[in-house]
């Protein structure tokens, strides 16, 4: 059973994102003293009174202006209201009742979702009730004075939220696979998210930097739960000013860190850029499973040779991710989009896979039979005694040798290729740790390992 949803609604700069961070005990929602920082619907999990629910933060509602993203923000707010059990409408107690608040109240009365009214920025308990009193005029029920920044009154508000949540399902839901959708600005990440979800979950625009938050979306595919993380486009550092986009990019890197698998989106028309390479390196550095999705394939003139030729060219530049599957799609038409999920499942399975020591050493012995370790000019030869898997996520192996410095980069890459050829791990990075050991100790430890 999906978690119930609580929507946060209000005009710009009343403290909605600060309240989200307070309710969810996080800093995932971007807070910045500038209207319009939040644009898409962003989701986080909240917990109160033994209940877990999803809090959806929405952009600031403005009804007398249709410039930039404001119509799309209103659409996102409507979608949030449609899926919510209850909406928390936030107003600014210090600024007082405004015409914008009255316009939002009129819009809310057309919605079917029940409403609770929170009067934010009431840091003084003595003045809070007086500040909240004028908001009775909105006709949205009792205005509750709160302070999102200090937490005052938020507990009482959450107690009321619990009354609107459906009965709790006692059966525990399995952990979803977390998939981060990452890439440069304007490669089609939000279009891909919308195609996958079958709705406008994210605002799509040709303007770079439209997505600023990391947008969490929960869906199910063939019995598997997924949490999709659509991230802000990552540009060159000197192109980014301090502000909402700066914070959004930091959220993107955090999304990579907390993901199980990354979908790196490449623009088929533009090919691989320096920023794509840096992003690929970041994914590999974090040790995340990955697949490369080449979007806008519908815009490329092609014949039967175009795809293999382009894949070869792209892989030559994305050498960090030579192990990642590559898929050519069109987020606009939906071409091959559904293939992303089985490839992602396979990558996650390989990322979590463990292999017995006996099987690891069969592969290593075959590698040694095909190509002996290098010998120095002085006649010293590297000796690889045995190996064992020491970790998963990503799969990591310790190889015991006489002297690690005798094994150069070329031979180390050869051993990794042989491990992949013999054991698989498609879609997952592999870590090899070369550790020096005396021959006698290595033989004793190998015998013990073989018995396990």
UniProtKB/Swiss-Prot annotation:
Q: Where is the EngA-type G domain?
A: 4-169, 177-352
Q: Name one GO biological process term.
A: ribosome biogenesis
Q: Which residues form a coiled coil?
A: none
Known partners and oligomeric status: Associates with the 50S ribosomal subunit.
The family database entries (NCBIfam families) matched by this protein are listed as: GTPase_EngA, small_GTP
Protein family? Belongs to the TRAFAC class TrmE-Era-EngA-EngB-Septin-like GTPase superfamily. EngA (Der) GTPase family.
What is the name of this protein? Answer: GTPase Der
Natural source organism: Synechococcus sp. (strain RCC307)
